[in-house]
């Protein structure tokens, strides 16, 4: 994975083996389950693995307390799908406590199998809709970091994800293409949901001409109990 070096990441032989095994399990399961439209090895490495790991630099910047920070950071990946970005981040940062949330139970079952086969410990698996899980006491405002590569409008995605983040924590969505207008439209929703835009890191995915952005949103106050709204509403009627 030459792309990892471009991101400033040095992978051990065992980590490289984990990524290769993950790739093999992904393409094999994809034959019977719709996990990804991308199956060529080089494309999976670039568009899934490297894209997931583009957060590496921001995690380094957020690391305030030395290596111990990783041992206490509780991360949730909302709408994880085939495990991106949660599993790649867990491989590179094995100390992270990672929760993978997805609405499709058969995907969650497969993710458990993947993490077991890869020897990844400290991973939790949750089946359900973000609108419902985000209201449960064991998940609401319990995470230091929420990440998501889910394809959704930033206003809607913020309503799905911000309820999981504790005050002082961060929500970092992965976005593709031009996002300035979308970000401008989402600023009010972000504020309503207790967030404050801290930074936007724009970059080109290594080995491609694909524009990417990491939007860093800090949780500065608790979310009102009225959010998230009932299932479907955040998408049908985004906060404005």
Task: Set out the residue ranges of the language-model regions.
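SAM/dcSAM-binding transferase cores
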Residues: 184-240
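Helix-to-beta-strand junctions that scaffold the AdoMet/dcAdoMet cofactor pocket
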Residues: 93, 165-167
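Short alpha-helix immediately C-terminal to the canonical SAM-binding loop
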Residues: 107-109, 179, 183
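Conserved beta-strand signature within the Rossmann-like core of class I S-adenosyl-L-methionine
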Residues: 168-178
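Short loop/edge segments at beta-strand edges and connector loops
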Residues: 13, 39, 127-129, 199-201
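Class I SAM-dependent transferase core
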Residues: 1-70, 76, 106-123
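Short "lid" loop at the C-terminus of a central beta-strand within the Rossmann-like core
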Residues: 131, 176-180, 205
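Conserved SAM/SAH cofactor-binding pocket of Class I
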Residues: 53-152, 158
